Amino acid sequence: MCIRDSSKSGNTLETIVNSNILIKKSDKNIFITENKKNYLNSLAHKLKSEIVHHNNFIGGRYSVLSEVGMLPAELMGLNSKSFRQFNNLIKNQKYLNALISNVGSTINLIKKRKFNSIIINYDEKSQNFFSWYQQLVAESLGKKGKGLLPVVSNMPRDNHSVMQLYLDGFKNNFYTFFYVHENNTPKINNKFILPSQNFLKNKNIQNITYAQKKATENVFTKKNIPFRSFEIKKRDEKTLGELFCFFMLETILIGRALKINPYNQPAVE
């Protein structure tokens, strides 16, 4: 069994607790932390475990494409180089134009006092990705009485809870629709379809959720609710790396426009 412990400071309480619950001396343990005196370094030396030193200028939420994220990716059999095709990104004018356009639109929405960034997520496998997004946006921008509140809604479940508020409640929200095209989703059993629902015949889960997404976007358009939409054609390392970079750069640029430091978290400290 291999346990990988990561903490930039090496003194994060939750990491220390988890370490002492999970780690056994006989395990293969790998520690990722700054090259300084801290708890994880001391524990690693005691266990004679491997230590990967983390650059102290890369904050936790920005470290996803560093060794903190790429070591476990490699252990999972993924290609870390495919995540980090930075040279291709900076030469991709379409990507850069989209980034600049989205930053400008977000700043304009903030000026209109729309402070809630709601993710309308139609991809269950991306829930952890958007947990990272919540930390990125809230911890980077929530300073000096400013910031955005990132909220993640998982669809279609939340159609039956918070969608009423999104459509007809207060108007200080803006939205990001997120969808990943999947080929191998379960298909409906035509045998049990009643005549009133014949339109469901030969459909799979992707057909249905995509139709729900498009219908919801149409309603948002009719009601003049601000939103943007991401449709991912292929789930792979390259695409995920592009998404990580996009949201990190977007957050940094918004922070600069708001004249706040997007890299620290002084109130938490």
Regions inferred by a protein language model and the residue ranges of each:
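Glycine-rich phosphate-binding loops that contact phosphosugars or nucleotide phosphates
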Residues: 4-95
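Structural beta-sheet core signal
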Residues: 5, 31, 119, 175-179, ...
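A generic structural motif
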Residues: 7-11, 72-78, 124-125, 182-184, ...
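Conserved beta-strand segments of alpha/beta enzyme cores
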Residues: 28, 50-52, 147-149, 226-228
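Short beta-alpha connecting loops at secondary-structure transitions
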Residues: 52-57, 200-201, 257-259
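Acidic catalytic cores of enzymes that act on phosphate-bearing nucleotides/polynucleotides
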Residues: 78-82, 92-219
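C-terminal hydrophobic structural anchor segments
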Residues: 206-248
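C-terminal amphipathic alpha-helical interaction region
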Residues: 261-269
